[in-house]
Amino acid sequence: MLSTSSSRPFKSKFRAAFWPIYNYELGKFIPMSALMFCILFNQNILRILKDSILISEISAEIAGFAKVYCVTPAAALFVIIYAKMINHLTFEKIFYYLTAFFIGFFVLFAFVIYPNIHIFHVHPDYLADWMERYPHFKWYISLIGNWGYIVYYSLAELWPNIFYVLLFWQFANELTTTEEAKRFYTLFSLFGNSSLILVGFLMMNLSSKETIVKHFINISDSKITLVQISTILVTIVAVICCLLIRFISRNVFTNPLFYAKAKSGRSTSERMGIIKSFKYIVKSKYLWLLLICSAAFGFAINLVEAVWKAKIKELYPTVNTYAEFNSLYILWTGVAIMVMTIIGNNVMRMHNWFVAAVISPVIIMVTGVLFFVLIVFDQKILSLFDGAILMSPLALAVSIGGIQNILAKGTKYSIWDTSREMLYIPLDQELKTKGKAAVDVISAKVGKSSSGLVQSIIFTIIPTATFTSISPVLMVVFTFVCLAWIYAVRKIYFEYQKIA
């Protein structure tokens, strides 16, 4: 009897640490985990494709311009449209309409625009002539001349913030209580982000010369085939997402066991108009701090990624080789996220919210500064370790940048994302929906576009500048932004304690 009773606390602690889900909760937990898996599956295929196409077909420098002048205006427009949609449509219909729009364009690009890019784009010689005539405006000319790549990149950039950050987490926050969130959210992250490993293996094969696809079809252009097969996969998984949304809406939201409001129905209180809604949001100090945190991540990581991706293109210049390397990076990012999720789950249980939330900015700042130091002082560092480093300076820069990004994304997509979502749960319905839409969609793009704006101003003023030459300036800006992020996390923790 003694051994049996003493084993119960051990089993209880083990379950609390690794599987804090009760059997009756599986009807809610499993479909939500599957939905997150599918959304992230598509997100990471699109991430590999958008960078491989844009950077290989044009350049790494153009990405900053695209984020400032295309992605951010599109994100702002979406928030306005979404605020209108949420007043007139159910969440289920909004999800279907947005999915149809995005998938429709991706299919159009893969099967019509990309294979016939010479028809839709300005001739490269004509474009090069105009860029040579007006060097200070060459990147703006390139944006217009390569519009197909830019629109694809912009929509692929918006996918994570619309479908994952906004729609999935809004769905989860509505369905999940604060107590459940502490147990569910890290496991959502664990199962959902395992899709990165699958995507990594899958895309490595599709982008390689020895792809399994060549045993079934004749490949005339490997990059076109890569994009088309990937788009078919994205379309199939998007349909599965819609079916999961339908299942959860019909079976989980209507079950009082899973959703407390099912007995009385969802809130039917009158919603605010757009202008009144945004005035309400602007007055919220809480949302402003959330916006700073989200924008700081986008700003900081984009500074590091911009330099790193320029180095990747030097080492892997074609669409397929770039995609193959990107797939390997995504795979290891998935592994890092799963490890960090397990760590984060226990950190969140054993410590307060601030300890868990501050891990991401600290790791990103430390690893980012190390990467910039390597880029800025590469020759001096290599001379210090003469003969000890068995790779070229370029390969070393790509490898260190990859490690930095894997650790940064690993902590962000596991510990920080789950910590951030807990901040929305105590808020009222208006801030949970429209407030979340404004923060999640706009803030990340404001961060990336602000970073892109810094880069675009430099490249416009100095047409001969490269990412390597401006790295010292970017390193200083990067450090300042990370410190601001840490400060905002501390301030919002005090606000969270007041309402939680």
UniProtKB/Swiss-Prot annotation:
Topological type in the membrane: Multi-pass membrane protein
Domain of life: Bacteria
Compartments it resides in: Cell membrane
InterPro entries in the record: ADP_ATP_car_bac_type
GO molecular function: ATP binding; ATP:ADP antiporter activity
Keyword ATP-binding: yes
The keyword Metal-binding is annotated on this UniProt entry: no
Transmembrane segments annotated in the record for this chain: 21-41, 62-82, 94-114, 149-169, 184-204, 224-244, 287-307, 328-348, 357-377, 381-401, 469-489
Keyword vocabulary terms for this entry: ATP-binding, Cell membrane, Membrane, Nucleotide-binding, Transmembrane, Transmembrane helix, Transport
GO cellular component, one term: plasma membrane
Family: Belongs to the ADP/ATP translocase tlc family.
Family annotation (PANTHER family): ADP,ATP CARRIER PROTEIN 1, PTHR31187
Role of this protein: Provides the rickettsial cell with host ATP in exchange for rickettsial ADP. This is an obligate exchange system. This energy acquiring activity is an important component of rickettsial parasitism.
This protein's name: ADP,ATP carrier protein 5
Protein species of origin: Rickettsia bellii (strain RML369-C)
